[in-house]
């Protein structure tokens, strides 16, 4: 028997909140005022974790090269093509580091961080927490512009009709574009790879030699890695790229999946009791509000209990 529960919450926390369903299905909707996005999580988010008894050190974004180079970066970097085939890496502080054009680079973004990278062709990549991107120092002499992603990234690709852009996900799985914007979610252990098109058109192939699926804006292709099946569906693409603007946006997402996302965003460990496995939530919250705010919101709109034990956040 379904029942509907309404609880009053503070107006400063949300403009609309609803709780509906049975003990196995809870939906909480949250809408907050848009603010200028910042680096996530912000210092106050780390302070929240300290106050809650969770010790978190600010993790480092690291860029490495196949020749042994290792750089610690902050929030953004840009590859710039110079005269005579030279390439330089410019950091957000203005520091420039010359790079050999044949270098293969990799940037690793740990849990608790995000990073923005401009490639030498002007294409932009936003990397979410817990992600890795492999790419060449320059595409100048390449017939294709190829990169490899593990984790989640949002791409805005500069159009080049002579050189398609290729995003490789492993095992021949590939996305080919000319000029467009799209989100790729390919975290290890998730069991599926999801690509969502925002603008333009992309071609998707699940493996080498497989028939290519062409996506239009607001379409999504999902590959089940265990079953090997591919499905295309219509979605609101803005939901899937909202993270790069500083939003945590979730629709009918299970609490275990949401807890896993919170763990990546804030670099913490979140455990969910078995009884909450089928609870689902929908909402849109600024990530820089901090994890304490988000967990309190879940408690305010449901019977979820949040507590910290031995540095681990437990939801029961």
Mark where each language-model region is.
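A residue-level detector for the "anchor" residue at the start of short, highly conserved motifs
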Residues: 5, 10-22, 31-316
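N-terminal intrinsically disordered, acidic low-complexity segments at the extreme N-terminus
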Residues: 1-3
């Amino acid at each position: 028997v379904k029942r509907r529960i309404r609880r009053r919450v503070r107006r400063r926390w949300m403009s609309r909140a609803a709780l509906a369903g049975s003990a196995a299905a809870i939906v909480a909707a949250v809408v907050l005022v848009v603010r200028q996005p910042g680096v996530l999580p912000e210092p106050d988010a780390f302070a929240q974790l300290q106050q809650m008894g969770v010790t978190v050190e600010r993790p480092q974004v690291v860029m490495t090269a196949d020749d042994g180079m290792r750089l610690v970066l902050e929030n953004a970097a840009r590859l710039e093509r110079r005269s005579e085939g030279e390439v330089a890496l410019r950091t957000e502080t203005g520091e420039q580091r010359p790079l050999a054009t044949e270098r293969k680079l990799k940037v690793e973004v740990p849990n608790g961080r995000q990073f923005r990278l401009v490639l030498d062709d002007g294409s932009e990549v936003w990397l979410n927490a817990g992600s890795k991107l492999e790419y060449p120092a320059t595409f100048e002499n390449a017939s294709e512009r190829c990169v490899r992603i593990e984790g989640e990234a949002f791409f805005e690709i500069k159009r080049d009709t002579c050189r398609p852009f290729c995003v490789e996900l492993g095992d021949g799985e590939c996305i080919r574009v000319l000029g467009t914007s799209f989100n790729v979610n390919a975290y290890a252990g998730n069991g599926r790879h999801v690509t969502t098109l925002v603008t333009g058109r992309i071609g998707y192939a699940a493996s080498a030699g497989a028939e290519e699926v062409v996506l239009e804006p607001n379409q999504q292709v999902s590959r089940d890695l265990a079953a090997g099946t591919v499905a295309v569906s219509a979605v609101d693409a803005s939901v899937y790229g909202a993270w790069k603007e500083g939003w945590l946006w979730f629709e009918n997402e299970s609490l275990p999946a949401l807890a896993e996302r919170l763990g990546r965003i804030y670099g913490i460990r979140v455990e969910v009791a078995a009884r909450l496995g089928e609870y689902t939530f929908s909402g849109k919250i600024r990530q820089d509000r901090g994890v304490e705010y988000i967990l309190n919101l879940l408690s305010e709109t449901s019977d979820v209990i949040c507590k910290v034990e031995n540095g681990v956040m437990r939801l029961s």
